[in-house]
From Swiss-Prot:
Coiled coil segments of this chain: none
Classification of source organism: Bacteria, Pseudomonadati, Pseudomonadota, Betaproteobacteria, Nitrosomonadales
GO MF annotations in UniProt: rRNA binding; structural constituent of ribosome
KW Phosphoprotein (keyword) present: no
InterPro entries: Nucleotide-bd_a/b_plait_sf (IPR012677), Ribosomal_uL23-like (IPR013025), Ribosomal_uL23/eL15/eS24_sf (IPR012678)
Keyword terms, alphabetized: Ribonucleoprotein, Ribosomal protein, RNA-binding, rRNA-binding
Protein name as catalogued: Large ribosomal subunit protein uL23
GO BP, sorted A to Z: translation
Organism the protein comes from: Thiobacillus denitrificans (strain ATCC 25259 / T1)
Family: Belongs to the universal ribosomal protein uL23 family.
Length: 101
């Protein structure tokens, strides 16, 4: 496989995941958590974070989150499944979503 196109890198990351756990791993393990495209690879995610946020990536771990079964009145429905990526940054690197930088 050749180089990843810049257009693909801009589409890979959908949104940061802000939760108690993501805040905890950001402080303790220097990781940031993103919601990504379901077909994104670890290499694409790492390259996208490095190019978009101008940081050095040490590693990427991904997991598929299954959609929960939810009820709306009598009807049972299912939320969409999605993919989550934990991106470990090299020491000294930081992405701060709270300040918008």
């Amino acid at each position: 496989m050749g180089a990843i196109s810049q257009e693909r890198l801009l589409k890979v990351i959908l949104a940061p995941v802000i939760s108690e756990k993501s805040t905890r791993v950001a402080d303790k393990l220097n990781q940031v958590v993103f919601r990504v495209l379901p077909d994104a690879t670890k290499q694409e995610i790492g390259a996208a974070v490095a190019s978009l946020f101008k940081v050095e990536v040490a590693g990427v771990q991904v997991l598929n989150v299954k959609g929960k079964v939810k009820r709306s009145g009598r009807v049972m429905g299912r939320r969409d499944s999605w993919k989550k990526a934990y991106v470990t940054l090299k020491p000294g690197q930081d992405i701060d979503f709270a300040s918008g930088q």
